[in-house]
Swiss-Prot record:
Species this protein is from: Cereibacter sphaeroides (strain ATCC 17023 / DSM 158 / JCM 6121 / CCUG 31486 / LMG 2827 / NBRC 12203 / NCIMB 8253 / ATH 2.4.1.)
Protein name stated in the entry: Protein translocase subunit SecA
Lineage: Bacteria, Pseudomonadati, Pseudomonadota, Alphaproteobacteria, Rhodobacterales
Residues annotated as binding Zn(2+): C892, C894, C903, H904
InterPro entries, A to Z: Helicase_ATP-bd, Helicase_C-like, P-loop_NTPase, SEC_C_motif, SecA, SecA_CS, SecA_DEAD, SecA_motor_DEAD
Names of the cofactor(s): Zn(2+)
Name of the gene: secA
Length: 908
């Protein structure tokens, strides 16, 4: 009997069905326009683009009104440039993306082409469109491939990748459509907000982004902060000493919670720890583990414990070239340049005996959650998003629409087979692989870690089954292994690397076969080679289809159903036959951690024999419920963390906005004056309280403060003795004196130089104060959770204190800027000559030694902004000796944004 919900869906359709139905009329209009656009010449297509741009940018026509014509033009452009005519379902996907949704499209449905439609339409507004990919290879490939379509339509394409020059990046962002990775977009946003002038900024705004593999970037990577950092003090010796203590710990000294991936010391552990730290001298005599002074060493020991108990080699990381390379748990790929924060990475380096890199100080940071919420409109594509639809809507305001496939999915998804032990499961897996291999059916075996993929490989070697292994160790051969994975009888063991972005074609990859054949015989005629290989491929593909298509075999369930669905999605592309199954055991991590006891009792009751597996829909439902609970818990964690992140994000936007305003303003003397007056007000309130008499004023303290902050030797004691002098009179006289002082400085430096000095000091001080503030907020964040024990809401406490800290930072900023401007002065003739001699000596020494030298000391006002270091990238101090002859009116090579004569070429 049908339930009421099922009956209603049969009559009215699902919400997704209604969304799909709502755009069919638009697709029909695009199809009706097809003959009109097919009749256009190549130049006519470009002219249509120019016409659309005028209608949007000058005529005020909406993009929605223009959609049918723009999509029809884009379809024709793609047909001429690539020989590909977009299917109706691809047009649907493009419409949903333009409307600010996530289009869930299965493997092989042509998502790359789909993105061109909304990208083209939105680029007509002239504000730039960003197409976001998960790695640099895909960004370059898609930009080159789809760039042909945009060129046919008369639009420019740019691609952004690491280590480009500022000019190259600026040109890429200025293009109509820009391809880039999520990492590079985020880092460029941070770098732009550390620039000295607006002209140096690369990005031109955040109008519309299309995010490929959107669930990976906005869910899996959501909490990953992008950090631009600089080096701090080297404490490698401390990490090494702490690491030697960890193996001495017994099980009763700590408590490991696998569900939350957390490890904490017990009371016995703390006592043992204090004793050993005192013995090794890491804790000073007479100091307790609970003293505030012990916070740092306790933090390092905790990180050492986490490194040993929660991070395992070949699971969470691998060791390569004297480095710890982290592995993405969702994709199984190495994450180059990614480091764990708070000293945890250094603790792992000490554990593995590799070189310990110094910790880094955060200069600027942003999470993907907050970066992508900067865009006016956002769209995304993936093969798996439905299970996270609630999170996409709540956090990003993105709806999820499942786009129908062009051909029905012919893959058979079998129920999970559950064994009692891992040994029995592995026996079942090997038997199943052997059976499929003998029938000629290609098999993709999904594992969750490197060590498990290699353990299974050993079992297959013992069984005499030829196979390939794809994991982070063999990532260089990825393209070849994936190309061969669909061949007759092929067996491929892979970590989660094969779960996303890989297109396994039945019978193998034709293009790869053609390339290999031509490489082996360069004299062969390409057309003849292609014709022969295509004929052979068609025959092999039919044989693979007869064998059942690609068999995807999962060896464990992941915490997230999405990752499992991604693995299944490798099979059954574009209507091809296929099969998927998961082989599990009660010893698997997910089963063990999330309650295999009940299932174990059921299996015992059924009287299962050795090597038997239970296969039943009930088991699947139980597992999916467990996964849904884990997903809900992870969502709650991400949602709660986002509330904390939003506090910093609001402050970041305020600071970056203020910074941009300063860069855009030519004359900052008024801002500097406002800051000066505020500092004077604060000093008077502090030393001459309201409603107090002159004999109650702290004249001595006020005199010192005025000298220190304003650089003025004001006769405050004399003023205080005058009749009728109150706080307002003192304020007015100090303001006048400070204004006279700054006017004299401007005359001494020259107006242009003074404006440049004010801008540089303001920007440098903002950056320095923001760095300190980030560190303070990190410390507050790490301890505020304990307020919950006192029945106080940690989030409310964090908001209140973070706001107070922000106000304190702004106050400190005003004081520092005022003080620096008061101290800056032109150099005397003797100082100028001494500096020039030192500079020339350095140049001669550098030329003789052919080695870089540190730049000469400079006055505060003329010092260049330090170059931030990105973790994993090399950045050094600017070296004037290597610049050669620089014209005095040219931009300074240090990158400060000033002319050379006002920066490193200053004679004063």
């Amino acid at each position: 009997m049908l339930g009421l919900g099922t009956l209603a869906r049969k009559i009215f359709g699902t919400p997704n069905d209604r969304k799909v139905k709502s755009v069919r009329s638009l697709v029909a209009r695009i199809n009706d326009l097809e003959p009109e656009f097919q009749a256009l010449s190549d130049e006519g297509i470009k002219q249509k683009t120019a016409e659309f741009q005028r209608r949007v940018q000058e005529g005020g026509e909406s993009l929605d009104d223009l959609l049918p014509e723009a999509f029809a033009n884009c379809r024709e452009g793609a047909r001429r440039a690539l020989g590909l005519r977009a299917f109706d379902v691809q047009l649907m996907g493009g419409i949903f993306l333009h409307q600010g949704n996530i289009a869930e499209m299965k493997t092989g449905e042509g998502k790359t082409l789909v993105a061109t439609f909304p990208a083209y339409l939105n680029a007509l507004a002239g504000k730039g469109v960003h197409v976001v990919t998960v790695n640099d290879y895909l960004a370059k490939r898609d930009a080159e491939w789809m760039g042909k379509v945009y060129a046919q339509l008369g639009l420019a394409t740019g691609v952004v990748y690491p280590f480009q020059s500022d000019e190259e990046k600026k040109a890429a962002y200025a293009a109509d459509i820009t391809y880039a990775t999520n990492n590079e977009l985020g880092f460029d946003y941070l770098r732009d907000n550390m620039k000295a002038s607006k002209e140096e900024m690369r990005q031109r705004g955040h109008f519309f982004a299309i995010v490929d593999e959107v669930d990976s970037i906005l869910i899996d990577e959501a909490r990953t902060p992008l950090i631009i950092s600089g080096p701090s003090q080297d404490r490698s010796d401390l990490y090494t000493k702490v690491d030697k203590l960890i193996p001495e710990l017994l099980e009763e000294h700590y408590k490991l919670d696998e569900k939350t991936r957390n490890v904490t010391f017990t009371e016995e552990g703390n006592e043992f720890l204090e004793k050993r730290l005192l013995e090794t001298g890491l804790l000073p005599e007479g100091q307790s583990l609970y003293d505030p002074e012990s916070t740092t060493i306790v933090h390092h020991v905790n990180q050492g414990l986490r490194a040993h108990k929660l991070f395992n080699r070949d699971q969470q990381y691998i060791v390569r070239d004297d480095e710890i390379m982290l592995i993405d748990e969702f994709t199984g790929r190495m994450m180059r340049g990614r480091r764990l924060s708070d000293g945890l990475h250094q603790a792992i380096e000490a554990k593995e005996g590799v070189s310990i890199q110094p910790e880094n100080v955060t200069l600027a940071s942003v999470t993907f959650q907050n970066y992508f919420r900067l865009y006016e409109k956002l769209g995304g594509m993936t093969g798996t998003a439905a299970t996270e639809a609630e999170e996409f809507m709540e956090i990003y305001g993105l709806g999820v629409v499942e786009v129908p496939t062009n051909r029905p999915v012919a893959r058979a998804d079998e129920h999970d087979a559950v064994y009692r032990t891992a040994r029995e499961k592995h026996d079942g897996i090997v038997a199943s692989i052997k059976d499929a291999h003998e029938r000629g059916q290609p098999i993709l075996v999904g594992t969750t870690s490197i060590d498990k993929s290699e353990a299974l490989s050993d079992l297959l070697k013992t069984a005499g089954i030829p196979h390939n292994v794809l994991n982070a160790r063999q990532h260089e051969q990825e393209a070849q292994i994936v190309a061969d994975a669909g061949k007759l009888g092929a067996v491929t063991i892979a970590t989660n690397m094969a779960g996303r972005g890989t297109d396994i074609q039945l019978g193998g990859n034709v293009e790869m076969k053609v390339m290999q054949a031509l490489a082996a015989d360069p004299a062969a005629h390409p057309d003849e080679v292609r014709a022969r290989i295509e004929a052979e491929h068609a025959e092999e593909k039919e044989r693979v289809k007869e064998a059942g298509g690609l068999f995807v075999l999962g060896t464990e369930r992941h915490e997230s159903r999405r990752i499992d669905n991604q693995l299944r999605g490798r099979s059954g592309r574009q209507g091809d036959p296929g099969r998927s199954a998961f082989f599990l055991s009660l010893e698997d991590d997910l089963m063990r951690i999330f309650g295999s006891d009940r299932l174990d009792k059921v299996l015992s009751t059924l009287g299962m024999k050795e090597g038997e597996a239970i296969v039943h829909p009930w088991v699947n439902k139980s597992l999916e419920k467990a996964q849904a609970k884990v997903e809900a818990r992870n969502f709650d964690i991400r949602k709660q963390l986002l509330k904390f992140d939003d506090v910093m994000n609001d402050q970041r936007k305020a600071i970056f906005s203020q910074r941009l305003e300063i860069m855009e303003t030519e004359d900052l003397s008024e801002i500097a004056q406002d800051m000066r007056y505020q500092v004077i007000d604060d000093l008077i309130d502090q030393h001459m309280p309201p409603r107090s008499y002159a004999d109650q004023w702290d004249i001595e303290g006020m005199h010192r403060a005025v000298q220190d902050k304003l650089g003025l030797d004001a006769p405050l004691a004399k003023w205080a003795q005058e009749e009728g002098v109150d706080q307002d009179v003192v304020r007015e006289r100090l303001c006048e004196a400070s204004d006279r002082q700054m006017t004299e400085k401007a005359e001494a430096f020259g107006p242009e130089t003074m404006r440049s000095i004010e801008k540089q000091i303001l920007l440098q001080t903002i950056d320095a104060k923001w760095r300190e503030h980030l560190l303070t907020l990190e410390h507050l964040r790490s301890v505020v959770g304990f307020r919950g024990y006192a029945q106080r809401d940690p989030l409310s406490e964090y908001k209140t204190e973070a706001f107070a800290l922000f106000e304190s930072m702004l106050n400190s900023l005003r004081q520092d800027v005022t003080q620096k401007l008061a101290q800056v002065r032109p150099l005397s003739e003797e100082e100028q000559q001494a500096m020039m001699r030192q500079f020339l000596d350095q140049q001669r020494a550098a030329a003789a030694a052919e080695a870089p030298v540190a730049p000469a000391p400079q006055p505060a006002a003329a010092a260049p902004q330090p170059t931030p270091e990105l973790v994993g990238a090399e950045a050094g101090e600017p070296d004037p000796a290597a610049w050669g002859n620089v014209a005095r009116n040219d931009p300074c090579p240090c990158g400060s944004g000033l002319k050379y004569k006002h920066c490193h070429g200053r004679l004063d």
